[in-house]
Amino acid sequence: MAKILVFDEAARRALERGVNAVANAVKVTLGPRGRNVVLEKKFGSPTITKDGVTVAKEVELEDHLENIGAQLLKEVASKTNDVAGDGTTTATVLAQAIVREGLKNVAAGANPLALKRGIEKAVEAAVEKIKALAIPVEDRKAIEEVATISANDPEVGKLIADAMEKVGKEGIITVEESKSLETELKFVEGYQFDKGYISPYFVTNPETMEAVLEDAFILIVEKKVSNVRELLPILEQVAQTGKPLLIIAEDVEGEALATLVVNKLRGTLSVAAVKAPGFGDRRKEMLKDIAAVTGGTVISEELGFKLENATLSMLGRAERVRITKDETTIVGGKGKKEDIEARINGIKKELETTDSEYAREKLQERLAKLAGGVAVIRVGAATETELKEKKHRFEDALNATRAAVEEGIVPGGGVTLLRAISAVEELIKKLEGDEATGAKIVRRALEEPARQIAENAGYEGSVIVQQILAETKNPRYGFNAATGEFVDMVEAGIVDPAKVTRSALQNAASIGALILTTEAVVAEKPEKKESTPASAGAGDMDF
């Protein structure tokens, strides 16, 4: 396959065009007056969204070189989303500004590596300032404000605050689609552990890459399963019931895994397999915890149970099992309350006698899993398009709220990034040459989110930014784009999680500096396909 090679300025400019294509589509969604973006779907109705990462994921450019730039910017959005769960649009806007200002300087003869060092030092200074401005999130009011801002919707904020109040800040909260028009909060007993599906072929929803099993049997095996003959008797028994099956084992491999995948793909049996959580003796105990929660029995040869002799009565049951690539949540386990309480009491006794800090931490984790429940937010809407958009906003808001609990909140609306400018300006005085220029690139980029929020609301961005910067006494002073007033952002409830703001800046600078130091791009050469006269009048078209 022939390749295209592009060097120096031409390579960087091609990447910049790709970056701009994604950023221009994404940045219109920023802020309370952010505009909608309509996404065409191959099947079904179009999606209308204000979520930056959703828009970014949809962009594929025809030009191979530009598409590489677009993919790099998508990486900024998805990385920020993975770390903090929100802030994707802010990260995109920052990255675009760093690339734009940086390439101007590289074209004028600046040393890209010195610029990169300057950018990194400036980001470090800005991050310290963000941490200094952070306010810890203690009460319900602060949690509600963060969720409301993230979703642009007070109803979302209230429900997430209710959910966190019920299950605690460390509790498990899941967002599901409701069959009705109403959005409701339900509290369900549940058990979650950090192991995902062994094979992606077990996925039932390719869009979210999740496997969901409703009213499932749960087979809990202590050993590694590789021999399919051991597994077949119980598989046949479950297949006759027509119910799905979750297998939790040390590992499932070889012909046993192949058999499960083939049965799943053929539709003979809805099945998923996950590795057991923990290691050694702790794994044995956690499997017993899961057995207590689901009302099953651990199939262990130590206890005299063999897998080939397993019966349906030994299997656990659960209303719903949700498995992602990283974790498994068992909701509505059919275990007896007294069995679960016996496990909890046993762990409490162990806690009293243990001296090891590590063992204590792990025991408390097990206790939380057994004692805690799952808060389920069931999202309802009139149409499928609205439902998907609303569910997405709930997920975003939930992630933002968790990030806020972790690292605190800062004034929103791009104000915190503007306040970080003073730290960067102090740093610029200590730097010289192209390193100082690199820091100035970050200084200019820090204005961009506030400017964009104002412009999306129909105001002149640069005027708003200057007015905020002119107020030096109150670091929380900023512009409420929803009402068009200048206010104390924290008092007005316009706050962002510090983690989101920090991650957005760090990821944007990382990709921005990468593009500035690019000297060559290698891309696939597009194939010229022969035109085929598929239908009358179509002979001149490329297919």
UniProtKB/Swiss-Prot annotation:
It holds the Pfam family Cpn60_TCP1. GO terms for molecular function: ATP binding; ATP-dependent protein folding chaperone; isomerase activity; unfolded protein binding. It comes from the Bacteria. Residues 524-543 are annotated as: Disordered. The keyword Mitochondrion does not apply. Its EC number is 5.6.1.7. It catalyses: ATP + H2O + a folded polypeptide = ADP + phosphate + an unfolded polypeptide. GO terms for cellular component: cytoplasm. SUPFAM superfamilies: GroEL apical domain-like, GroEL equatorial domain-like, GroEL-intermediate domain like. Disulfide bonds: none annotated. ATP binds at residues 29-32, 50, 86-90, 413, 480-482, 496. PANTHER family: 60 KDA HEAT SHOCK PROTEIN, MITOCHONDRIAL. Together with its co-chaperonin GroES, plays an essential role in assisting protein folding. The GroEL-GroES system forms a nano-cage that allows encapsulation of the non-native substrate proteins and provides a physical environment optimized to promote and accelerate protein folding. Forms a cylinder of 14 subunits composed of two heptameric rings stacked back-to-back. Interacts with the co-chaperonin GroES. Belongs to the chaperonin (HSP60) family. NCBIfam families: GroEL, PRK00013.1, PRK12849.1, PRK12850.1, PRK12851.1. This is Chaperonin GroEL. It comes from Thermus thermophilus (strain ATCC BAA-163 / DSM 7039 / HB27). The lineage of its organism: Bacteria, Thermotogati, Deinococcota, Deinococci, Thermales.
